[in-house]
Design a protein with these regions (language model features):
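Hydrophobic alpha-helical segments
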Residues: 1-185
Length: 185
């Protein structure tokens, strides 16, 4: 392992210095993403974890119950709560690229109230804000979420927020800055 940090405080492991298990996890993540972004660089250190986190992250990229706009509402709410620079910067851009209005993304990241005209987007905003702030959801919001999203959508939002909580905490612990390039692969 390199002694000099290459990704915030984290010193990435050159591929030829990885254990066989780490190399296997690395290849698995590359196959899933085509690259090794963000916390995946760190997860390689723990091959068993990497083999769980990679597929979970992949679930939230294609073929699940949320639109990209809906995803970015929930992700930006939880990332704003944690304040980790690297993923917050990436998902501020992703939210805007998904078509969320700039003022809505900026309000979410600043912790300011906002609203959405789309029913699903609004209930995702409400439930995610409740979960991130109060860590409890009132019955009325629960009922509206069930009606708008169903339990599949609700569990996608909740698990997505948990996944990005882990991402934010990992990158905050290693103090990864917003513009961290990491080691060339």
């Amino acid at each position: 392992m390199a002694d000099t940090p290459t990704f915030g405080r984290y010193a990435e492991i050159p591929y030829d210095q990885m254990t066989p298990e780490q190399q296997d996890a690395y290849r698995s993540l590359i196959e899933t993403r085509g690259r090794l972004p963000g916390p995946n660089k760190i997860y390689v250190h723990n091959p068993k974890l990497a083999k769980v986190m990679g597929p979970l992250g992949a679930h939230f990229r294609t073929g699940y119950s949320l639109s990209e706009r809906e995803r970015e509402i929930a992700v930006n709410i939880i990332l704003a709560k944690w304040g980790s620079a690297y993923p917050t910067n990436a998902h501020e851009r992703a939210g805007k690229a998904a078509g969320l209005p700039v003022d809505k993304v900026e309000a979410i990241l600043a912790g300011l109230p906002t609203s959405f005209t789309d029913t699903r987007e609004q209930i995702i905003y409400e439930m995610a804000t409740c979960l991130a702030n109060a860590r409890w959801v009132p019955k009325g919001i629960f009922d509206r979420a069930v009606a708008a999203l169903g339990h599949v959508g609700i569990t996608d939002v909740i698990t997505l927020m948990g996944f990005y909580t882990s991402v934010a905490m990992t990158l905050a612990f290693y103090d990864v800055p917003a513009d961290a390039p990491g080691m060339a692969r």
